[in-house]
């Protein structure tokens, strides 16, 4: 039995879950999300709980069992509470601003980077004096939020010598000493 897959998912108040054909739809105060579920996995909704069951004990079905349980759990958490990620810009002259869903980044290149964010993701930028600028992203869809964060981070990944770049708040960057340390 999959240790993650066998755990039930509780449905909080204000969230409705429906299962039709092979699509699970979760509606809540933060929005609506849908997910395809492989026909080898059975979704049972009863008594305010969601249970996932698999037909056989094949290796692929064991992995799908845990996968779909995690995806549906993320959907339930997303539509009820939502997900939030914070990115920090470390570097001299690094700035971020937004006009609605258009994010403008100044990351030390000769040009500014403009990124149109999906409508499901809300963005807020903070720039305080003597602190690194922050980009705060919120969404009900955890997968989409992670993809957007990693896309922004890929514009200027933190480098190991000075630690400059776009990083998650609280992320530890593995630092290297320079050439002079070997002497």
Swiss-Prot record:
Pfam families: Ribosomal_L6. It comes from Porphyromonas gingivalis (strain ATCC BAA-308 / W83). Belongs to the universal ribosomal protein uL6 family. GO terms for cellular component: cytosolic large ribosomal subunit. The gene is rplF. This protein binds to the 23S rRNA, and is important in its secondary structure. It is located near the subunit interface in the base of the L7/L12 stalk, and near the tRNA binding site of the peptidyltransferase center. GO terms for biological process: cytoplasmic translation. This is Large ribosomal subunit protein uL6. GO terms for molecular function: rRNA binding; structural constituent of ribosome. Transmembrane segments: none annotated. The lineage of its organism: Bacteria, Pseudomonadati, Bacteroidota, Bacteroidia, Bacteroidales. Coiled coil: none annotated. Part of the 50S ribosomal subunit.
């Amino acid at each position: 039995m999959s240790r993650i897959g066998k755990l039930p998912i509780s449905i909080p108040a204000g969230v409705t879950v429906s299962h039709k054909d092979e699509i699970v739809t979760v509606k809540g105060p933060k929005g609506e999300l849908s997910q395809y579920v492989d026909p080898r996995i059975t979704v049972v909704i009863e008594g305010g709980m969601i249970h996932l069951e698999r037909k056989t004990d094949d290796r692929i079905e064991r992995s799908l069992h845990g996968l779909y349980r995690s995806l549906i759990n993320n959907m339930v958490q997303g539509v009820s509470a939502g997900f939030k990620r914070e990115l920090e810009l470390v570097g001299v002259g690094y700035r971020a601003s937004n006009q609605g869903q258009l994010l403008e980044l100044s990351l030390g290149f000769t040009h500014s980077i403009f990124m149109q964010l999906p409508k499901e993701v809300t963005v807020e930028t903070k720039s305080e004096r003597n602190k690194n600028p922050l980009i705060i992203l919120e969404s009900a869809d955890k997968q989409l939020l992670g993809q957007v964060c990693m896309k922004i981070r890929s514009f200027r990944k933190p480098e190991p010598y000075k630690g400059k770049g776009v990083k998650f708040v609280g992320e530890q960057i593995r630092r290297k000493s320079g050439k002079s340390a070997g002497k």
